[in-house]
Amino acid sequence: MKKYRKALIFILIIIIGVILNRKLQWSPYLTDSNNLKIITNFVRNNYILSIFLYLVFTIVGASILALPGVTFAVVASGLFGPWIGSLYCLIGTTIGAVLSFLLSRYLLKNSIEELVKKNDRLYTIVFQTDSKKEMLILMITRLLPIFPFNLQNYAYGITNISIVKYTIGTFLFMIPGIIIFSIGTEGIINVESRNSMFIIALVIIILMAIIGIYLYKKYKTLTARGQNER
């Protein structure tokens, strides 16, 4: 139970957020035309520039500023809507993750290794010599919110995983998490679609948790089997 604690806490936070929003009625503040008018008008009148500025913010925020991953999905959903916003977020965070990977591999290897060693579980899981487990490990760490997004990106840079495999896996396995936060944000902002958005988000969260835990158990089984064969 202890090893799933962070994932369960994450799910609990989402549920509490939904309940508090219903009780405290945060949505009117977020949907107040006076608060959003300037931003929405700017995006509408400067759509291409808005996309460019968002991508720059996301790439820099993910690779240099070490902002929490959820930040980028929330901002994208608020600016562009949940679905197209998810796409822009996925593009930006993938580029940011790859940039972090490259910085770690070619410029910051020694310092990053010392930093990653402080997170025992991440260090143990990520640093595997068996290349057959690389995509499985990448899937687990992306699906389960138990490791810091930015630290993961730098950690993979000092492993043996290829940049092609890392890029493809990162792009694919970040999709569920980005959609969750994007539609969750839409549910808070848009009163009419709130219930449906929260239901979709909750279903995806549950599926992610189930799949992530299953994959983690599979990883532990394969690791134990490999050790026994030695």
Mark where each language-model region is:
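Hydrophobic alpha-helical membrane segments of integral membrane proteins
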Residues: 48-91, 128-187
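C-terminal membrane module of polytopic membrane proteins
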Residues: 170-230
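Membrane-interfacial helix-loop-helix
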Residues: 2-10, 17-54, 94-151, 158-161, ...
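Alpha-helical transmembrane segments of multipass membrane proteins
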Residues: 13-18, 61, 65, 96, ...
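Ubiquitous "structural anchor" signal
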Residues: 74-77, 89, 100, 104, ...
